[in-house]
Amino acid sequence: MKHGRITIRDASFVVEAPAHVSIRLRRLFGGAQRYRAGVFQLAATPEHAHDLDWFRDRHPLDIDPAIESKFRELVAAHERKLAAIAAIDEVGYVPREFELAIPPREYQRVAADLALKTGGLLIADVLGSGKSATAICTFTAPGVLPVLVVTMTHLTLQWQREIARFAPKLRTHRLRSGRPYAFSDVKVEVDPMTKRRRVVRDRGMPDVVICNYQKLHSWVESLAGKVRTVIFDEAQELRHEDTNKYKAALAIAQECDLRVSLTATPIYNYGIEILNVMNVTAPNQLGTRREFLDEWCGESRGDDNKAKVADPAALGTYLREAGLMIRRTHKDIRREVPELTISRTVVECDVAELNKVADDVAVLARRVLDRIGSPLERMQAAGEIDYRMRQATGIGKAGAVADFVRLLVESGERVVVFAWHHEVYSLIGAAFERQGAQIPYALYTGKETPAAKDEARRRFVEGEAKVLLISLRSGAGLDGLQFVSRTVVFAELDWSPGVHWQCIGRVHRDGQADPVMAYYLVAEQGSDPVISDVLGIKEAQAAGIRDPEAADAPIAAGAGDDQIRRLAEDVLKRRGHVVDN
């Protein structure tokens, strides 16, 4: 009988097999890409190697001698991973110890132990559970240094301080420029604990390099292959594969022995985003993009960049069982956080603000819906609709938001207010300054430098400011607010439910002593009704993957994906125009 053959080409297994074997192969590997009759391609992952090895026991397939050792190495890697995952569920399992200045909690040791055994792990523990400390545990294991920590711009100093607390013997360095330089340069640094300036000379490669996502692309050639471990903090930043930071992250991750991603919200919008986050965490473990789309998203998916996972709970379960993701809730880690109450409160919106942009937005909406102009012009029109309608809605609500927050402050609350447009911050701030008893506030938005943001945080935490006005997308990773505030107000809405959860997580986290209130102040006009509807659809994707065993873990809804088209339709309908469905 003719035997088939397995070889490797471009990081993929190429399997040539006779017809009767091909039929069975397709049944087992439904996502295999078919080149021609009897020839298939699969991502060369340990899991696929393990399955192919099992398949070879039953069907005639020879292995190219040139890849025999590589194939066996991949099979063994998967068997070690399965054993490590199984061990965690065994009675009497005790995770390894980690020598830190502040002893880690057991659940942190469990995740760190699993990451070291598997080589790639997404830690999606609930917000405020100490994921950074979990990552720092791994720094003390043999063969892990040097480490690269990639985080958001405003969190680089916070990471340096955390490492100094937990592992003070490690030498850390925050990249200070987007232009690569030698680590042996003479420079002035500020001690993260004492705040004193000092002139130092690095002794070559530091133990831990801390970089923000914006600088990563410039440093990829200097860091790829030079660091053994990479930590992607707030890994939802890597959810889009067409960005420079994603490409740089993937290039560095592929050269590392250990990859750990940290985020409680790996999905902001659509299920396809989990593939990109997992590709930098455990490259190829979810197969190729085509395999993932075919097997997890189904045929009726529309735009691949907005593809929804057909059964989010099933994918979430698989990620856990395969040792690719670990997530613990407050109950799992036995750290009770006070109750969270979410209130959707309708407020008045100044219709005059919406009327100012109504005519222009209607023209743009018709251009989008009727496909007038080039694709670029329609894309620009869609962006302009989004910007103008959300801004006008935010401005129209600003007065009502300020009045609402003033009542909270007068009742003794210190309030964290989330918005998006600078005009909205300005109007709310001006209202605070006009009101009889002025309300001191601090700004933590996209305009402030990291130092200014740190000062704003200090003023709020120390009580100099009663309100912290913060950007919807600037708060990820920010810690310390939970000790002084229990009240969150959304002055504006984001299109992504993950953004809202990140915002709420600034106060609803470990260390919070009181029940938390989160107020969504929404208008019945403008962009709020459409955004609210879209948020429900997207949350179905995130919730199922994040918590597949939750009683309300939903199956993806079948509603349309094009949020701007829906906003455009709403604009025209409210002005009495006929819109074809």
Predicted regions and their residues:
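Walker A/P-loop
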Residues: 118-138
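Conserved helicase ATPase core of P-loop NTP-dependent helicases/translocases
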Residues: 182-184, 416-418, 426, 433, ...
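A conserved SF2-helicase RecA2
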Residues: 495-580
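SF2 helicase motor core recognition
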Residues: 216-221, 267-271, 425-429, 453-457, ...
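Conserved Walker A/P-loop ATP-binding site and its immediately adjacent core
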Residues: 134, 144-165, 268-273, 420-422
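Charged, low-complexity
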Residues: 13-121, 165, 170, 191, ...
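Interdomain linker/hinge connecting the two RecA-like lobes of the SF2 helicase core
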Residues: 119-122, 235, 241-242, 270-271, ...
